[in-house]
Amino acid sequence: MRDKIAGALFGMALGDAMGMPAELWGRKRVKAFFGRIEGFLDGPAENDVAFNYKKGQFTDDTGQALVLLDSIASTDYEPDTRDIALRMLAWAEKENAFENNILGPTSKVALANFRDNIQDSRITDKALSNGSAMRIAPIGCLFRPEQKEEIARYVYQVSRATHTSDVTIAGAAMIAEAVSSAMVKDDFDEVMEDVFGIEEIGYGMGCET
């Protein structure tokens, strides 16, 4: 199981780094520009986000996932929203994420509000972005796939600093469930059954959009 957890983390970082040059681009544009991406590449100057990165670098997806892991490890795996937000903000400032257009729209506003001591949950409650889902994969390593209620609840707890809407919690819970299931099951259809089995639970955890 330790090897599978390590594989999930390395796979996340390697896949992120390999996909980095195509950040935010649609399939058609990616195929026209790159043909096929079969190895690590520099972020192209034409990409408004990826131009910040060199080949082999992972993006904010993995960066935030590692911040999240650092936070929960420091609090004995009891999610602390303030600690997560503080660490996310410190990471963002270190990476110049606000200036370099690295943060997504929801995380950017939520973290800026936290920094400026502005209490306003509207941006997180109505979020339609994927900031929680993109960093959530490691959470799936902490649970067995049948623990769907526990997974969804934990996903909400570690996401609420930036995302609290039903659709974002459901999406993130499905990613975490996919990782949890794939670690113990080899059948793709069984994994997908688990993934869709947590969708409504995740929706029920978040604020209605």
Predicted region positions:
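Structured, active/binding-site neighborhoods that engage oxygen-rich ligands
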Residues: 1-209
